[in-house]
A protein has these predicted regions:
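Outer-membrane beta-barrel pore domains
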Residues: 79-82, 87, 91-205
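Outer membrane beta-barrel
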Residues: 1-57, 66-86, 111, 137-176
Length: 205
């Protein structure tokens, strides 16, 4: 709901940080969003990650990817461009082999839209003691290209997409991509994905 000009989301809900490149899963928390005008916004959030994710630690099925977290984001749109800066601090991170350590991640990303075509790029920087001790990478980049998009209410709507990821373990907590991101947990992952979606019937994508 809203309290004056502030949009409030509270309880258990799904949230995505940095276009899902840092985290995309359930949280128990509160998120406040303020429209700053001129298509810009400010977001602040605090809570606990409630992902019930499968961490890379042996026998840890069902353990959440991380514990408490705080997040701040600033973004907006300028003509054909949109962009967002994120900062996330998470405690007790289990995913990506981080063994319950703390993780600090910031990102800056932008997209350019031309008709149905959308091109994006993002840079991420992480800080995690376990990854540092291992000698793993603490930075990452993501590039994306999209054409069109499916609309769950519009039968026959469709979209195509491709993304390239090069993310060190320190830059990600829980990623929703179709692929094995945990085979070499402290190394992070590198590769691309290609896909598409189409709405066959209302609410059937």
């Amino acid at each position: 709901g809203r309290i004056g000009t502030v949009k409030v989301t509270a309880g258990r809900y799904n949230d995505a940080f940095a276009e899902s490149n840092i985290y995309d899963n359930r949280v128990d928390g509160i998120k406040l969003g303020v429209n700053l005008g001129h298509a810009s916004y400010l977001v602040g959030a605090y809570g606990k990650m409630a992902s019930a994710d499968v961490s890379s630690a042996p026998g840890s099925t069902g353990i959440s990817a991380a514990g408490r977290y705080a997040r701040a984001a600033l973004g907006g749109e300028w003509g054909r461009f949109d962009g967002e800066i994120n900062y996330v601090k998470a405690k007790d991170v289990m995913n990506m082999g981080k063994q319950g350590s703390d993780d600090k991640i910031w990102s800056v990303g932008t997209n350019y839209k031309l008709g149905k075509l959308k091109v994006g790029a993002m840079y991420l920087q992480g800080d995690n003691d376990v990854v540092d001790a291992y000698g793993g990478s603490d930075w990452g980049t993501v590039y994306s290209l999209r054409y069109g998009a499916s609309d769950k209410k519009k039968t026959g709507s469709w979209g195509l997409f491709t993304q390239y990821f090069n993310q060190g373990a320190a830059t990600v907590i829980s990623h929703p991509m179709y692929g094995d991101t945990k085979s070499f947990p402290l190394e992070g992952y590198k590769g691309y994905v290609v896909g598409g979606n189409v709405t066959l019937a209302p609410n059937m994508v």
